[in-house]
Amino acid sequence: MKKQNIPKEISEFITKEEIVMFQELQIKIAELNNKTNLTRLIKGDDYWISQVFDSIWPFKTFPNINFDNKKFLDIGSGCGFPGLAYAITHPNSEIYLIDSSKKKTDALKLLIKEINFKNNIHIINDRIENLAHQSSMRNSFNIATTRAVSNPSTVSEYILPMLKKEGLGVLYCGKWTDEENKNLDKTLEILEGKFKETKKILLPRSKGTRNIILIQPKNLCPEIYPRKIGKPEKHPL
């Protein structure tokens, strides 16, 4: 396997065995990219910082929170980040990867067949607006997240209905302003959710600023949410 310039910040987070798995994942994604346009972030720092590091650091940086042995949901998983990154670093957790694109979920199924994941991994081709109203899925996850949607209010409407009462939503944000904080606070009030904790870092090698916002249910989310397909994105709460 070709030697790569892997950022030291990643080596501080994960084991050598996990690095090997991430290298295998990189190779397989690159192969699948020839048939299915999964991602352009597959080489060098684009992969190791923008994909791997960005996916795993939230689960390594809150020492007071146990992220192991959980039921984990990745909404709009695309090429598998952050879900597969979390799977590699938390092998005792059960993973659900959801995407509305059948091409992408078919590619994800190939990935998990060819890489020796220790987790029980489920791939589902559907919209979260549909799945959230299925009794077998709603209020059943310890952790739910997505990097596919940027608006925190929209993300919250997708995530909170999926969480158990003690569950945790992980929101990936770039900039984080007072106005965004105010808007999210209003949304959480509607969805019966609350803030838990926030953290901000500068990604290595000048890859930008990242804010992580942790939210959780105050009570179970009202049954009417999420709204019908398209509404949470077009008309955030």
From Swiss-Prot:
GO terms for cellular component: cytosol. It comes from the Bacteria. It is an enzyme of class 2 (transferase). SUPFAM superfamilies: S-adenosyl-L-methionine-dependent methyltransferases. S-adenosyl-L-methionine binds at residues 76, 81, 99-101, 128-129, 147. Its main location: cytoplasm. It is found in: Cytoplasm. It holds the Pfam family GidB. Keywords: Cytoplasm, Methyltransferase, rRNA processing, S-adenosyl-L-methionine, Transferase. Its EC number is 2.1.1.-. One of its GO terms (molecular function) is rRNA (guanine-N7-)-methyltransferase activity. Belongs to the methyltransferase superfamily. RNA methyltransferase RsmG family. Specifically methylates the N7 position of a guanine in 16S rRNA. This is Ribosomal RNA small subunit methyltransferase G. It comes from Prochlorococcus marinus (strain MIT 9312). The gene is rsmG.
